[in-house]
Amino acid sequence: FGVLAVTSR
């Protein structure tokens, strides 16, 4: 998922 990558930032 792309959302998880965004929140990781």
Curated annotation (Swiss-Prot):
Where does it live in the cell?
Secreted, Cell wall
**Keywords (A to Z) from UniProt:** Cell wall, Secreted
Its GO CC terms are: extracellular region
Name the record gives this protein:
Putative Na(+)/H(+) antiporter
Q: Which organism is it from?
A: Cycas revoluta (Sago palm)
Q: Give the organism's phylogenetic lineage.
A: Eukaryota, Viridiplantae, Streptophyta, Embryophyta, Tracheophyta
